Every structure is written in C-alpha cells, then in structure tokens.
Amino acid sequence: MQKKIFITVALCLSICTVKAQKIPDSLAQDFRNFLAKNFSMYRTVNLNWETKWAHNYTFTQDGNELEKGKRRDLHKISFSTMIPVLKLKKVSLYANVQYRSYQFDAIEKTHSATSAIFSQDGYDYFAGGLNGTYYINVFNKPLTLSASVIADGWDKGFGKVQGLLSAVMIFKHTKTTTFTAGIMGMTLFSSIPIMPIISYWHRFNNPNLSVDITMPSQFYMRYQLNSHRFSAGASMTSDNFYMKPNLKNVPDICYFSEATLNPEIVYEYIINKHFYLVARAGASMVMMAGLYSDTRKGIKVRNEEGQTEVEPLVKMKRNMVPFFNLGVSYSLFK
C-alpha cells in the first residue's frame, strides 16, 4: 500500500512538472534563507549540549512490568551539519551528517542494581545522507520537491537506510507572511505512509513580533529586538539510539526511541547574519517511547476507534521533566 501511494504521488507531480513555468530566480535563495533563520536543523552547522532532570521510568511488555528504575545525570551532546554539494537556481543537493552522544546513569529501583535495559552509561548514534530539492512553478505557485536518503548506525555497526519524500507548495511569500502546505512520506518507522505539512509565518503590525507555526511539529510566538530574539511555544523532537538490552523475548539489538513534546522558552543571540547562540529551557513530555527491533518494527494494535497503530515491543513511561539546552549554530545563508 505504501509503495502504491508513493508511485501515485510521483506520477501526479511528474505530470504537473511538464507544464511548469519558470520559478523566480530569487525564490530558491529566499526559501533557503527562511529555513535557516527559523529552523536550526537547516543551518550549516549545529552544536548543542542538553541536560534533563533525573526522573523515574517504567518499562512494560504486554501489560507486564519489566523494570522500574531511575535515570539521573542525563547529558546529550549533538552535532549536525548540512553541506551544500550543488546549489543552483532550481536545484540544490546537500550532504548531511548527525552525531549524538547520550550519557546517563540508570538504576533499577527494586534491587538498587544497574538497569538490565540501560546497561551502559553512554550511547552513540550516527546518521548521514543526501537531500535533493527541486524548485519549480505549478499553477503559478512555487513548488519544492525534495527527496532524502538517510543511513544510521552506532558505535557497534550499521543500522538502517530510510527514504523521505516531500512536496511543499508556497502559496504566499511576502515580507510579512509566508504560507506553505504539502505532504511528506517516509519509508520506515511510521504507521502513516503520508502526512500533511503546513507552515505559517506572519509578522504583525509590531515589526518585532511574529508567529511561526509548522504543523505538526512546532508552534512559536517570536519577539526580536535588534540582535536578541525571544520565542515561546512548543516543538516535537525525539531521542534515538541502538542498544543491547538484557531482556528476554526481544531482539539482541534494539532501537530505543523517545518522542517528546517540549513546551519551551528560547533565547537566541544573533551574532551576525551567519552565527547564532541559542539557549532553551522547558519541559519534556513523552508522547511515545520504548524499544523497537533494529528494523524499526513494532507491534500492530487497534485503538479504541478501531484504527491500526504501531506500538513499541517494550513500552516506556516516565515523568515530565525540565530540560536545558545550550547551542551554537552557523548558517551559510543570510
């Protein structure tokens, strides 16, 4: 079913492209600048350190408790880079690399022993790939078509390869308002083959105040005064790494994933048009967390509405915890 959807979308887009008009020369550059300014992940280099408060957690499988414990001294260092390989008026190609290091202590509370699941005090995660974007004009509206291939792994070997396709149309792009809508599909780790993407940015009559919404991933109110920008809102993020849990009835190598919703306050000091210092503080709330097989496969279950959902092989629950993040970013684009 997923392959049929991807093929249908690809055919529709290829038909539209035949009658496409020329895209304005400045649009591709404007779009890159907008992404770099409002989305740190699209900046050329990002380096971040993050810490979370100690918290209790519980792992369950089929309703049975496997481990109840506590994680403390949590630290994460993350590095990412997007390097332009090819940048033309209508086409861009980027190579990207990500590295994350997780450090924490995990104690099983029943016997005050080292966790059987988090048996190490550190985990490394690597990912890298290529992203290509094509800028065209369809029905007098700019359209960006993107495709990515990403491979990941850890310090003990290779993980998986996944693909991502997206089509985003820019319905409005002025000095005060940008509105886009589109679709995105993934080949792995998603029970929804295709999902909508909607983004809206607007600067109010007060030129320092703006709203920045990207559904379903983030919402922010921003206030910028000279080189200082303050934001209040929320974003969805995830922490992922491969591990070897000491558990029965699960694969030897598992993929730990923790998807979170993070209400937060963000302060950015814009050193110049290329460098940013960023500080974040807020709360981390788990939406879905647990262990999957290294192929990202979970257990298919039916919810109360009768819809099929994919759950982890082993579920994890934890408390909402405060976090603090400090980082620096560099962007080639102004």
Model-derived features: where do they sit?
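Residue-level signature of outer-membrane beta-barrel architecture
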Residues: 51, 81-85, 132-136, 171, ...
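Short glycine/proline- and aromatic-enriched beta-strand/turn motifs that initiate or cap beta-hairpins
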Residues: 21-83, 225, 329-334
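Outer-membrane beta-barrel translocator/channel fold
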Residues: 54-63, 68, 110, 214-297, ...
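Transmembrane beta-barrel strands of outer-membrane/channel proteins
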Residues: 45-55, 95-101, 147-151, 181-185, ...
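Transmembrane beta-strand segments that form the barrel wall of outer-membrane beta-barrel proteins
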Residues: 143-155, 165, 177-187, 198-219
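Outer-membrane beta-barrel "beta-signal"
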Residues: 198-201, 317-334
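Hydrophobic, lipid-facing positions within transmembrane beta-strands of outer-membrane proteins
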Residues: 73-79, 124-130, 147-151, 161-167, ...
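Repeated loop/turn-to-beta-strand initiation elements of outer-membrane beta-barrel proteins
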Residues: 88-92, 137-145, 176-181, 207-210, ...
